[in-house]
């Protein structure tokens, strides 16, 4: 008997196999590298790519889409562009750039992508946040009302900074801009040791376009002072590509936002945004965007404003956290009217202007009081500081004016001579060595003596003032620590009497009377 083929059975078997087959079609948005030049890859395809989207090259190198044309995309390569070749495949990730955040990053040195570069192992953080995020709205914010103590007398007294403020540090190279930022970070050590967890100030130091040797010195200084334990250092050195230098401040800001959004306080230092602007200019010119003033692209203002607007003091409903920004700008020959300096001055809530002439005269920190201002920080000053700081700025400004006037003639009346003499004492009191931040109560003592006990102060030789102020503070700590403790908040009449008696006795001892 001949075997007959049952076609219906075969059809049913094939149908069952087809219906049971489960291999979903996977669509990927891919493109092909046309050319690579100086860290910029021109890619054909990527029809559905989004601006700012993260992409992967065949070699595993990451990139960011920063330019979109009809059929091509301009991608900045985050790494060595030698690993990217013409004809390589590029895949879209569907995500924007993210960095790890959290307490796990404290005490660590990372690059602009959040990868560890301190040979201390991987960053084991489960939390990640988008590098680019929207700044808090008006309703989510609260006015600045809590002080951020820098430990630098001339700043805490005359140009106070509040938590949530953006205060620019501007000046020529090598006159102490980074020192001010570092001393502010170091000064938080004593404060953090005495307060609750939610009142501590965590710090992020972002080094942009600096020499690796310079960054190593900064990290060592933070280690020596014990400040690295509450600080994260984000590094995009001069040897890193322009895209990494461009991303570094946004990565540092995101790390700080974690603390802000969780009801804590954070200080972010951007050192410096001049080099950040240069890196962005380089990228924009390579992407063939039209240049504007000083060859910067038209959106350079937005690049900095969207970064600095993320610094804020949050409302009670949003956890009361804060993110304070200390951007640094380097000027050329003191020219604050250049494009990038004027941009950042208009974005921030004030500026601390450092002057080369004052620095070379030996007045350090070399802060020019006439050009420096804090627009919102005075609301955050402690009561005791407000009481003694009121007349200090005027006295210093008058002294600077009279100092120039006195050069033209020797015949000065008694009142002018008194103002000049008082100014000399004030300048000596305000001088401060680097990396020696001074607690607010010690600052109050010295300024109270100048404002109210000048007769006592004038008995000291001007050349001995530096020794006198440090010896006096040590005398307070060893003999009257309770008076200093009370001064950290307010100043009553009883405390004023105590200070008068203590200073009178000490001046007599100091002069050997």
Curated annotation (Swiss-Prot):
Its EC number is 7.1.2.2. GO terms for molecular function: ADP binding; ATP binding; proton-transporting ATP synthase activity, rotational mechanism. The record marks 372 as: Required for activity. ATP binds at residues 171-178. Keywords: ATP synthesis, ATP-binding, Cell membrane, CF(1), Hydrogen ion transport, Ion transport, Membrane, Nucleotide-binding, Translocase, Transport. InterPro entries: ATP_synth_asu-like_sf, ATP_synth_asu_C, ATP_synth_asu_C_sf, ATP_synth_F1_a_nt-bd_dom, ATP_synth_F1_asu, ATPase_a/bsu_AS, ATPase_F1/V1/A1_a/bsu_N, ATPase_F1/V1/A1_a/bsu_N_sf. It catalyses: ATP + H2O + 4 H(+)(in) = ADP + phosphate + 5 H(+)(out). GO terms for cellular component: plasma membrane; proton-transporting ATP synthase complex. It is an enzyme of class 7 (translocase). F-type ATPases have 2 components, CF(1) - the catalytic core - and CF(0) - the membrane proton channel. CF(1) has five subunits: alpha(3), beta(3), gamma(1), delta(1), epsilon(1). CF(0) has three main subunits: a(1), b(2) and c(9-12). The alpha and beta chains form an alternating ring which encloses part of the gamma chain. CF(1) is attached to CF(0) by a central stalk formed by the gamma and epsilon chains, while a peripheral stalk is formed by the delta and b chains. NCBIfam families: atpA, PRK13343.1. Produces ATP from ADP in the presence of a proton gradient across the membrane. The alpha chain is a regulatory subunit. Belongs to the ATPase alpha/beta chains family. This is ATP synthase subunit alpha. The gene is atpA.
């Amino acid at each position: 008997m001949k075997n007959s083929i049952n076609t219906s059975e075969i059809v049913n078997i094939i149908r069952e196999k087809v219906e049971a087959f489960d291999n979903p079609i996977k669509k990927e948005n891919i493109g092909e590298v046309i050319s690579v030049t100086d860290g910029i890859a021109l890619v054909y395809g990527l029809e559905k790519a989004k601006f700012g989207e993260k992409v992967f090259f065949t070699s595993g190198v990451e990139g960011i889409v920063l330019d979109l044309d009809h059929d091509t995309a301009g991608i900045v390569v985050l790494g060595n562009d030698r690993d990217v070749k013409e004809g390589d495949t590029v895949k879209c990730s569907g995500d924007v750039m993210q960095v790890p955040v959290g307490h796990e990053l404290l005490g660590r040195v990372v690059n602009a992508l959040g990868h560890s570069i301190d040979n201390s192992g991987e960053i084991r953080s489960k939390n990640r946040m988008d590098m680019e995020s929207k700044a808090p709205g008006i309703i989510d914010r609260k006015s600045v009302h809590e002080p951020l103590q820098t430990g630098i007398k001339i700043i805490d007294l005359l140009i106070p900074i509040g938590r949530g403020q953006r205060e620019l540090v501007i000046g020529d190279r090598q006159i102490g801009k980074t020192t001010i930022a570092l001393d502010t970070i170091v000064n938080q050590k004593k404060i953090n040791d005495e307060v609750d967890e939610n009142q501590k100030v965590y710090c992020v130091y972002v080094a942009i376009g600096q020499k690796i040797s310079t960054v190593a010195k900064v990290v060592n200084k933070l280690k020596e002072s014990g400040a690295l334990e509450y600080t994260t250092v984000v590094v995009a050195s001069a040897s890193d590509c322009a895209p990494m230098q461009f991303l570094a401040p946004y990565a540092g800001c995101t790390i700080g936002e974690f603390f802000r959004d969780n009801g804590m306080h954070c200080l972010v230092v951007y050192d410096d945004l001049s080099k950040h602007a240069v890196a962005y200019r380089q990228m924009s010119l390579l992407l063939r965007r039209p240049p504007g003033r000083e060859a910067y692209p038209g959106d350079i203002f937005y690049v900095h404003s969207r970064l600095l607007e993320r610094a804020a003091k949050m409302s009670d409903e949003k956890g009361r956290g804060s993110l304070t920004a200390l951007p640094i700008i380097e000027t050329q020959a003191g020219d604050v009217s250049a494009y990038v300096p004027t941009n950042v001055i208009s974005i921030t809530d004030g500026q601390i202007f450092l002057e080369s002439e004052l620095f070379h005269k030996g007045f350090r920190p070399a802060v020019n009081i006439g050009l420096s201002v804090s627009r919102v920080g005075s609301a955050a000053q402690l009561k005791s500081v407000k009481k003694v700081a009121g007349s200090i700025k005027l006295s210093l400004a008058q002294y600077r004016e009279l100092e120039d006037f006195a050069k033209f003639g020797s015949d000065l009346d008694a009142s002018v001579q008194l103002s000049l003499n008082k100014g000399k004492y004030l300048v000596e009191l305000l001088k401060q060595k680097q990396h020696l931040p001074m607690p607010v109560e010690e600052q109050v003592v010295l300024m109270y003596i100048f404002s109210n006990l000048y007769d006592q102060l004038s008995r000291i030789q001007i050349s001995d003032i530096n020794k006198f102020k440090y010896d006096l503070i040590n005398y307070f700590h060893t003999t009257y620590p309770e008076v200093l403790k009370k001064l950290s908040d307010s100043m009553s009449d009883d405390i004023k009497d105590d200070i008068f008696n203590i200073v009178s006795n000490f001046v007599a001892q100091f002069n050997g009377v």
